[in-house]
């Protein structure tokens, strides 16, 4: 199986293709990307027959920015008979996957696929039973086995394949299902909530998103991102010349500072989180974020980089490389991840965590 399908936001297929071509090439897994505008997915076809599996095993999924999900597939199954779509699909997967842990019957995230998505949900139950009978799926769901993917691109046309549960998105179609909180000041709140789900393992939330932490929200008005921090019982400095939602101020957890986010300097030394969603050139935001991290003004940060109209992948890569270079220059170990989230539009969300290690019997960030 030499093809890898990558799901992405419709309209960002070229960026997704540029990224996978670049990062696969760095690992000497060569091939070419098939791109159809606004399709919501890209097919990366490797030149060597087993390189699809090698790619999804060796390249960390967390290193990808524009892909929501990926899986290796075989040839396209076409003209599935309406009276029996199951048998050809089972036949394609037998000998490819054994005792898979989960089945996902998916489509691309486009308006055209909405009707097809309804079919996929109904089709999943009988297909799962047939795949279990054939030994393709285990008799119970388990996160320790590969995920079986059936990806429909049109009625009666699908790709079949798999991904590794240790190196994929845990979410169906790569999209966390989040509900907009009725009391949140703006829909942007979902960006930060999704970022927490994508970047921070669930079993680390209690430690890294803990009650009583101090946080800073730069460019906070009206408070969509501050809302997520308050919800987790943090104390928040919300920095913006624009007003904050009264509902947030009434909690007593928010201090509103009428200042420019680019000029604000924290006075506390125990700030755990800094978040930032400002409409500004990405290079300017990246420079500010690097300054916060180098100076140790926060332990972790999540921020958005607005994308230009052209060369988006190159621009994001350049900004991330700048931040990495600044950290390296000052001897700071950090983990950097970036992803175009489902709730992002012309932007990507970046997470940087300074790594704390025991040095000479004390906790130290370096």
UniProtKB/Swiss-Prot annotation:
InterPro entries: RlmM_FDX, RlmM_THUMP-like, RNA_MeTrfase_FtsJ_dom, rRNA_MeTrfase_M, SAM-dependent_MTases_sf. GO terms for biological process: methylation; rRNA processing. Keywords: Cytoplasm, Methyltransferase, rRNA processing, S-adenosyl-L-methionine, Transferase. S-adenosyl-L-methionine binds at residues 188, 221-224, 240, 260, 277. The keyword Methyltransferase applies. It is an enzyme of class 2 (transferase). One of its GO terms (cellular component) is cytoplasm. It comes from the Bacteria. It is found in: Cytoplasm. The keyword GTP-binding does not apply. One of its GO terms (molecular function) is S-adenosylmethionine-dependent methyltransferase activity. The active site is at 306 (proton acceptor). It catalyses: cytidine(2498) in 23S rRNA + S-adenosyl-L-methionine = 2'-O-methylcytidine(2498) in 23S rRNA + S-adenosyl-L-homocysteine + H(+). PANTHER family: RIBOSOMAL RNA LARGE SUBUNIT METHYLTRANSFERASE M (PTHR37524), RIBOSOMAL RNA METHYLTRANSFERASE FTSJ DOMAIN-CONTAINING PROTEIN (PTHR37524:SF2). Catalyzes the 2'-O-methylation at nucleotide C2498 in 23S rRNA. Monomer. Belongs to the class I-like SAM-binding methyltransferase superfamily. RNA methyltransferase RlmE family. RlmM subfamily. This is Ribosomal RNA large subunit methyltransferase M. It comes from Escherichia coli O6:K15:H31 (strain 536 / UPEC).
């Amino acid at each position: 199986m030499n093809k890898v399908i990558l799901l992405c936001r419709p309209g960002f297929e070229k960026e997704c293709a540029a990224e996978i071509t670049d990062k696969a090439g760095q690992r000497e897994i060569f091939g070419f990307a098939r791109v159809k505008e606004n399709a919501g997915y890209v097919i990366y076809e490797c030149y060597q027959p087993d390189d699809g599996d090698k790619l999804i095993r060796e390249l960390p999924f967390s290193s990808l920015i524009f892909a929501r999900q990926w899986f290796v597939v075989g040839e396209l199954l076409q003209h599935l008979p309406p009276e029996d779509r199951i048998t050809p699909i089972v036949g394609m997967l037998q000998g490819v996957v054994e005792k898979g842990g989960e089945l996902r019957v998916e489509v691309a995230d486009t308006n055209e696929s909405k009707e097809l998505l309804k079919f996929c949900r109904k089709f999943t139950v009988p297909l799962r039973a047939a795949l279990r009978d054939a030994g393709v799926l285990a008799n119970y769901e388990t996160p320790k086995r590969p995920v079986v993917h059936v990806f429909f691109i049109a009625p009666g046309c699908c790709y079949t394949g798999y991904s590794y549960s240790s190196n994929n998105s845990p979410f169906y179609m790569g999209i966390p299902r989040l509900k907009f909180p009725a009391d949140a000041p703006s829909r942007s709140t979902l960006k930060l909530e999704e970022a927490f789900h994508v970047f921070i393992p669930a079993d680390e939330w209690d430690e890294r998103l803990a009650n009583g932490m101090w946080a800073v929200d730069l460019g906070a008005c009206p408070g969509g991102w501050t809302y997520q921090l308050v919800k987790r019982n943090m104390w928040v400095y919300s920095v913006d010349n624009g007003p904050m939602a009264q509902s947030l101020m009434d909690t007593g957890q928010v201090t509103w500072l009428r200042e420019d986010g680019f000029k604000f300097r924290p006075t506390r030394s125990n700030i755990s989180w800094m978040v930032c969603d400002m409409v500004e050139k990405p290079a300017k935001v990246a420079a500010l974020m690097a300054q916060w991290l180098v100076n140790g003004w926060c332990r972790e940060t999540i921020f958005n980089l607005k994308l230009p109209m052209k060369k988006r992948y190159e621009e994001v890569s350049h900004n991330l490389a700048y931040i990495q270079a600044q950290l390296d220059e000052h001897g700071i170990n950090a983990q950097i991840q970036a992803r175009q989230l489902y709730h992002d539009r012309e932007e990507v969300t970046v997470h940087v965590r300074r790594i704390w290690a025991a040095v000479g019997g004390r906790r130290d960030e370096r």
